[in-house]
Regions:
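N-terminal cap/lid segment of alpha/beta-hydrolase-fold proteins
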Residues: 1-34
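Serine-hydrolase catalytic-loop signature spanning alpha/beta hydrolases and amidase-signature enzymes
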Residues: 44-56, 75, 101
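Short amphipathic alpha-helix adjacent to the substrate-entry channel of hydrolases
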Residues: 53-76
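Primarily recognizes the serine-hydrolase "nucleophile elbow" in alpha/beta-hydrolase
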Residues: 96-160
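The feature captures the conserved acid-bearing segment of alpha/beta-hydrolase catalytic domains
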Residues: 138, 144-198
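C-terminal catalytic histidine-bearing segment of alpha/beta-hydrolase fold enzymes
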Residues: 189, 196-239
């Protein structure tokens, strides 16, 4: 039987780092003592708890974490309990705890942090957009869902399209897939309109031929360039 697509290889070749396991967080530290800036990667969802392996073990997140480490930044991948649309508050609370765990690591500069959200995990970015903490130097979004699907019951707090009004000067790096699901693409357009209305600091990286999950579905130079560009943009904000 074919493996599920979420176990596809990461399309950008990178020497894999063996992560340190600190359940529910995997750390990808560069060599040496630091202190290093850190990027915290937040997977999408909702994901049923029986789906195994959990996201921090997926090739794409091993790739992102290893890529961060190769650039001299500590990568952290967090499993969070977003199992149904009703779970955004619980997942947000788990992430808040994870943020402090990563910041407390002696190898991490606690004031140079980026948080990078993917897909259906992106509504969780509302927690940071509503009130950006001083330690947050960059917020990244890759093929993000930024409003709830019709018919889903989601806590109204978790609406980045509204929360971006409070983002201030926070740098936001948004990677947009050109062949995105139409509804998701509409939420991205609404977010960008809302961001423009308050002059939010958004850098857009377009992947014109990319699908949702282009980083594991579209093995192309375009995909690789988009990943590399996004990583460079984020690192430039925290170093």
């Amino acid at each position: 039987m074919a493996e599920p697509t979420y176990l596809n290889p990461f399309v950008l070749p990178v020497a894999l780092v063996t992560p340190e396991r600190h359940d529910p967080i995997d750390l990808y530290p560069p060599a040496g003592d630091g202190p290093y800036p850190a990027i915290i990667f937040v997977h999408g969802g909702p994901i049923p708890p029986e789906m195994q392996p959990s996201p921090r073990h997926w090739p794409m997140f091993r790739g992102y974490g290893s890529l961060a480490a190769s650039r001299g930044v500590l990568g952290a991948v967090v499993d969070h309990p977003l199992h149904t649309p009703a779970d955004y508050p619980a997942a947000g609370a788990a992430l808040a705890e994870a943020f402090e765990t990563v910041r407390a690591d002696p190898r991490v500069d606690p004031d140079r942090i980026a948080v990078w959200y993917f897909s259906g995990g992106s509504p969780l970015a509302a927690d940071l957009l509503h009130r950006p903490p001083s330690w947050l130097r960059c917020l990244a979004l890759t093929y993000p869902l930024l409003e709830p699907f019709p018919g889903t019951e989601v806590d109204p707090h978790y609406r980045p399209v509204e929360a971006v009004a409070s983002a201030g000067a926070l740098p936001i790096v948004l990677t947009r897939a050109g062949r995105e699901h139409p509804f998701i693409a509409g939420t991205v357009a609404n977010f960008l309109t809302a961001a423009a209305s308050v002059s939010a600091n958004v850098r857009i990286i377009d992947v014109p031929n990319g699908r949702h999950s282009f980083d594991i579905l579209d093995d192309t130079d375009e995909s690789r360039t988009a990943i590399d560009t996004a990583m460079t943009e984020v690192i430039n904000k925290i170093t």
